[in-house]
Amino acid sequence: MPKKTLLAVNCVSSRVAFLSSLALTCAAAFAQAPSATTTVAELPPHPWVVPSPREAQGYFTNLKEGGVYESPFVARFGLSMRGLVPAGQTAGRAGHHHLLINQPLPLDFKKPLPFNDQYIHFGKGQMQALVDLPPGPYVLRLLLADQGHIPYFVYSKPLNITISKQNKGVTPASVLGAPEIQVLSPASGEVLTVPFRVQFHASGYNVSNASPKVPNTGHFRLTMERAGTKSEVLNFTGGETETWLKPPLGDYKLQLEFISNTDGSVTSKAKPVAIGVKGR
């Protein structure tokens, strides 16, 4: 009998038990470290929607590495290849955002994230946070977690920023502004090659996968209008906050709406964005 087989027999009662034990060990080891494998996208069913060239990840849409800011300020969250759903709700691989302040990623991705000032939970499906920190350097991270606050391997790069001044007596409403939705990119007037990314944002609204029908939540709907053809309607019922598109060449008007997950009404409408799509 080969030496390796003898060692296996000495460690377990049978070859089957050995292989089962080995599989469990490998699975546990894999679960402890973030995966570098590209996640299969959960895409809305439309022929113009294409998979993201990026892996599933969180990111800040309005903050820059090395940026200097006065507080309070608004941090806006972006998410690739996943959707949002409030805490306590299950919808595929959707989750909710967490903002980590001066904290590394957890060592154990199988334990719930703590609740404190350095692990801030956005369990309603929010896409932004009002951040009010004293002057100094900070490292910010985004981390997506499931219904029980157990993190996915979906997170942002660490973002190093400096707070230069903390303004006192500032009301949250004056910083946050009125509730609205926006197309963050592309900008109106841009001419793009395919595929291109369209980023959505909701201020003052909670985003969710439509399936759980959570009250006070909604999802994005994008209508693409082109002269001489019927409008194309893309429903992001999975709670997605961005998409990659490959439409036919031409000029388009993008109209983004926020749709209630309980009654299907239009809760908010963004300013239209006019773009051109050309060949490479």
Predicted regions located by residue number:
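Short, compositionally biased P/S/T/A/G/V-rich stretches that sit at domain boundaries
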Residues: 36-70, 164-193
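Long, low-complexity serine/threonine/glycine- and acidic-rich segments characteristic of extracellular
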Residues: 45-51, 74-80, 88-167, 188-189, ...
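Intrinsic disorder/low-complexity segments enriched in polar/small residues
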Residues: 4-5, 33, 129
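Bacterial N-terminal signal peptides
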Residues: 14-27
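A residue-level signal for beta-strand positions that form part of recognition/binding surfaces
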Residues: 21, 57, 96, 180, ...
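Boundary at the C-terminal end of the N-terminal hydrophobic targeting segment
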Residues: 29-36
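N-terminal secretory signal peptides that target proteins for export/translocation
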Residues: 1-13
